[in-house]
C-alpha cells in the first residue's frame, strides 16, 4: 500500500501575498459590515490553522499585512475622500466592491507608505484581474496611475520620478469604470 504524502503548505513571505490577504479581509469586512481588525484577527487564526481560504503568510508578510490593516482603519475616511475626488462620474455604490477595495488598499499605500508607486499599482492590478471583472485591471490601473501622478505633482516630483518598476500594461482613464459594475461584482472573491 502506497501512502500519499500530503503537500505541506509553505508560508509565503511576499508583499504581494500580504496585499491579497488584506484585500480578502477588507472585502469580507465590507461585505459583512464587520470591523476590519476583527476580520483580520479571525483570518489570521484561520490561516494559522492551515485553512486555505486565506494565503499562508510568513512572519514578515503577516506583519506587513497587519500594518496595512491598521493603516486602512486609521485613514479610511481620507482614503475614501481622495478616491471620491479621483474617480469622476462614478459613486462607490456604482462600483464593484472588488474594484473599490483594491483601490482603497492601493490608495493607502500610495498615500501613507514609502513604497514605490509602480509595484503597488502592479500588485493592485493583479489582484483586480484575479478577483474582479473583465475590465477591473484596466480600471484600477487608470485610477491609480492618475492618483499616483497627482500625488507626485503635489510634492513637486516629476511624474516620471518614481518609475523604478515597469507600469502594468493595462491603462484606462481615471474617469472610466467597468462597463457593467454590477455584473463584475461577485458574491465573494473568486480565484481566477
Curated annotation (Swiss-Prot):
Keywords: RNA-binding, Transcription, Transcription antitermination, Transcription regulation. It comes from the Bacteria. Residues 159-184 have a biased composition (Low complexity). InterPro entries: NusB-like_sf, NusB_fam, NusB_RsmB_TIM44. Pfam families: NusB. SUPFAM superfamilies: NusB-like. GO terms for molecular function: RNA binding. Involved in transcription antitermination. Required for transcription of ribosomal RNA (rRNA) genes. Binds specifically to the boxA antiterminator sequence of the ribosomal RNA (rrn) operons. NCBIfam families: nusB (TIGR01951). This is Transcription antitermination protein NusB. The gene is nusB.
Amino acid at each position: 500500500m502506497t501512502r500519499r504524502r500530503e503537500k505541506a503548505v509553505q508560508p509565503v513571505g511576499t508583499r504581494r501575498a500580504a496585499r491579497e490577504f488584506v484585500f480578502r479581509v477588507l472585502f469580507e469586512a465590507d461585505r459583512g459590515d464587520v470591523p476590519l481588525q476583527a476580520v483580520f484577527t479571525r483570518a489570521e487564526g484561520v490561516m494559522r490553522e492551515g485553512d486555505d481560504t486565506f494565503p499562508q503568510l510568513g512572519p514578515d508578510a503577516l506583519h506587513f499585512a497587519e500594518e496595512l490593516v491598521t493603516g486602512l482603519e486609521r485613514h479610511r475616511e481620507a482614503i475614501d475622500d481622495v478616491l471620491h475626488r479621483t474617480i469622476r462620474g462614478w459613486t462607490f455604490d456604482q462600483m464593484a466592491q472588488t474594484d473599490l477595495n483594491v483601490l482603497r488598499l492601493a490608495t493607502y499605500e500610495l498615500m501613507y507608505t514609502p513604497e514605490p508607486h509602480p509595484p503597488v499599482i502592479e500588485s493592485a492590478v493583479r489582484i483586480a484581474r484575479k478577483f474582479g471583472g473583465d475590465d477591473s485591471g484596466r480600471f484600477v490601473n487608470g485610477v491609480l496611475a492618475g492618483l499616483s501622478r497627482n500625488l507626485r505633482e503635489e510634492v513637486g516630483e516629476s511624474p516620471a520620478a518614481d518609475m523604478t518598476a515597469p507600469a502594468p500594461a493595462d491603462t484606462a482613464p481615471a474617469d472610466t469604470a467597468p462597463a457593467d459594475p454590477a455584473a463584475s461584482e461577485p458574491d465573494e472573491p473568486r480565484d481566477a
